[in-house]
UniProtKB/Swiss-Prot annotation:
Pfam families, per the entry: EME1-MUS81_C, ERCC4, MUS81-like_WH
Protein's name according to its UniProt entry: Crossover junction endonuclease MUS81
Source species, domain of life: Eukaryota
GO terms assigned for molecular function: 3'-flap endonuclease activity; crossover junction DNA endonuclease activity; DNA binding; enzyme inhibitor activity; metal ion binding
Basic residues bias: start-end ranges: 113-128
Record-level GO cellular component terms: Holliday junction resolvase complex; nucleus
The protein's Enzyme Commission number: 3.1.22.-
Gene: MUS81
GO BP terms: DNA catabolic process; DNA topological change; double-strand break repair via break-induced replication; mitotic intra-S DNA damage checkpoint signaling; resolution of meiotic recombination intermediates
Length: 614
């Protein structure tokens, strides 16, 4: 066979053009993706000689790259050309390595000793798995837990290896994650680092080479014993070893007090970028809402009985409570793996429980170690996978969830977005909307936005954030109101206590207090339907009409304060109006609105069909 030209770019451009034409004929949405790839390929100046270079081009994902690789392989076969190693799949590379190995072994028998020495000096470098990868964790687990070299089952290895790996050992077909950390076991076997025996169950052993490499890895990371040795050391070790994937603590970490800085400087944990600091902008905005609302009556403080403005409260010292992470029970990895978050966080040394939450997907609470009473701490997360984010943008849940997070009065609200292994068509269609929505989350909504590669990075962030929260614990003033009228009253009470107790006087040596609500009050008051005002309920009713976003619903509610006023507008004021004119009433009523607040003809007719049709 002859050798193929190094640069495949001209062929790739030709093939992508053909795919774009075929997609156009079929009416497929993939035509937009192919056109974007085509534009990037034409502007790429360097030659494309391997699969890694091809994947580095913008918009070329794993699936597209694999399709193009197959076309290259077919082209080489039809034209009797040698397929470059960079475009071979794993099986082809393995077969080529075996052929080269056999050729080398047969040749070495007839070469001199000097020739053999020269050949061995040019041999391939020894395989060493990356730190905290699946292969690394499997070797460490077998070395630590299989002292007698009797072998271990897959389940036992995973249980021991999980603390030493940043990725999950189970795949998730729902998010197109078909490979897990356990896939590295095959690589270790191919490199003669582990061996297997039996079928059901299959038993895994370390080879002599595997024992030697595992011992070197153990020494390199300074690991002295298995995690079972000490629970406290276990948690510190696990957390210390998990801060290495770009979402961890760095020197830009902002602290509110010298005591906090001293506390973290002595901790084995490195510093996380932009996590827990006082969100002054949200606090000012909430205080402004309180000033614009009803003016509270003159407040009386009975410090002896711990009553402020007729509302009882408790004081918890830092030592009186522990930090617990609550995960919403709807947050799952897949239908077959519903307990992924809880299991993974507990492995990382985090106390985690699963229960339905009224707002958000991840909530940090303080539990009194004596009474068991629970209070909501000032940290809340909303988690979205990219495809779910697209759906929530289209149906209006995106804006609603952000508003509900702000109603909690929690100072540190995070919006966590997870990327997907392969994007669906709807993600490409809404790429511009996603970008603008995420930008608004940081600017207009003033929430912390964090974007992660996969579910494992999200879990690692939650674990590391929990550690920081534990180190920055404050004395708590736990509010215990007897009667809360609605969600706005819940927020007003919280802000009232903050204005009283969280503003330290300049000449007083007051401890650092945080005012928080009981978790039971949080659950009762912040549900989607619990204790809603007529205004909030009416807005939700309007948003059930397809096409009515939160912005449009608010505009309609400002013009028609109650459902009754909208019904009277159609059935009383315009009772004798022609039906065709009635269909356009909403469009004409809001014709002066701008942007996404304007109501079009089709939407006006939908609103008429629901509210104005006899």
């Amino acid at each position: 066979m002859s050798v193929v030209n190094d640069d495949f770019k001209p062929l790739l451009i030709q093939w992508v053009e053909e795919e774009a034409i075929n997609a156009t004929k079929r009416g497929s949405k993939m035509v937009d993706l192919y056109n974007k790839i085509l534009f990037q390929l034409r502007g790429y100046e360097l030659p494309i000689c391997d699969l890694k270079t091809l994947k580095s081009i913008k918009y070329v994902g794993d699936k597209t790259a694999n399709q193009l690789r197959k076309k290259i392989a077919k082209h080489c076969k039809e034209n009797e050309l040698t397929l470059p190693r960079g475009f071979m799949d794993v099986a082809e590379k393995h077969r080529l390595d075996l052929e080269e190995s056999n050729l080398t072994s047969s040749t070495s028998t007839i070469k001199t000793t000097n020739k053999r020495a020269k050949t061995s000096s040019k041999s391939k470098p020894k395989y060493v798995p990356k730190h905290r990868s699946g292969g690394f964790a499997i070797l460490i687990a077998l070395y630590l837990y299989d002292k007698d070299r009797n072998g271990m089952t897959k389940e036992r290895i995973i249980a021991g290896a999980t603390p030493y790996c940043d990725r999950s050992f189970s795949n998730n077909a729902a998010s197109k994650e078909f490979y897990s950390a356990w896939s590295s076991a095959k690589t270790l076997e191919n490199h003669n680092l582990i061996s297997t025996t039996g079928r059901s169950p299959k038993i895994y052993f370390l080879t002599d080479e595997g024992v030697s490499l595992a011992q070197q890895l153990k020494t390199a990371i300074g690991l002295s014993s298995p995690p079972e040795g000490s629970k406290k050391n276990d948690r510190n070790m696990i957390m210390e070893q998990s801060f290495d994937n770009g979402i961890r603590l760095d020197t830009s970490f902002e602290l509110s007090s010298p005591a906090g800085r001293a506390m973290l400087s002595s901790s084995p944990i490195r510093r996380i970028s932009n996590p827990v600091h006082s969100n002054r902008a949200i606090q000012k905005m909430l205080e402004k809402e309180l000033r614009n609302g009803e003016t509270p009556p003159s407040s009386q403080h009975d410090a002896g009985n711990r009553i402020y403005d007729g509302i009882k409260y408790e004081v918890w010292r830092k030592e009186d409570y522990e930090v617990i992470v609550y995960m919403d029970n709807r947050e799952i990895r897949s239908r077959a793996d519903r307990d992924h978050f809880q299991t993974r966080l507990q492995t990382l040394g985090v106390k985690c429980e699963v229960k339905p939450l009224s707002s958000g997907d991840v909530l940090w609470v303080g539990r009194n170690t004596s009474t068991g009473t629970e209070a909501v701490l000032n940290y809340l997360c909303e988690r979205k996978r990219l495809d779910d984010l697209c759906d929530s943008i289209k149906d209006g849940r995106f804006q609603e969830q952000k508003n509900r997070m702000k109603k909690t009065g929690i100072k540190h609200c995070y919006y966590l977005v997870e990327d997907m292994v392969s994007y669906q068509d709807k993600v490409y269609d809404l790429m511009d909307s996603i970008q603008s929505s995420l930008t608004q989350t940081m600017t207009t909504a003033r929430l912390y936005l964090r974007r992660f590669k996969d579910i494992d990075e999200t879990t690692a962030f939650i674990a590391s954030n929990t550690k920081v929260i534990e180190n920055l614990k404050s004395n708590l003033i736990v509010i215990k109101p007897q009667d809360i009228k609605n969600q706005q009253d819940y927020l007003n009470i919280l802000l009232k206590f903050r204005n009283k107790f969280e503003k330290t006087q300049p000449h007083q040596d007051n401890p650092d207090y945080e005012c928080v609500q009981l978790f039971s009050r949080f659950q009762d008051m912040l549900g989607k339907t619990n204790q809603m005002t007529v205004k909030e309920m009416f807005i939700l009713m309007l948003m059930t009409i397809r096409g009515v976003s939160l912005e449009k619903a608010v505009v309609i509610q400002n013009r028609f304060p109650t459902p009754k006023s909208l019904l009277e507008y159609y059935h009383t004021e315009h009772a004798t109006t022609d039906t065709n004119i009635k269909r356009d009433l909403m469009m004409n009523e809001f014709k002066d609105q701008i942007g996404n607040k304007k109501i079009g003809k089709a939407l006006s007719e939908k609103i008429y069909n629901v509210w104005g049709k006899p």
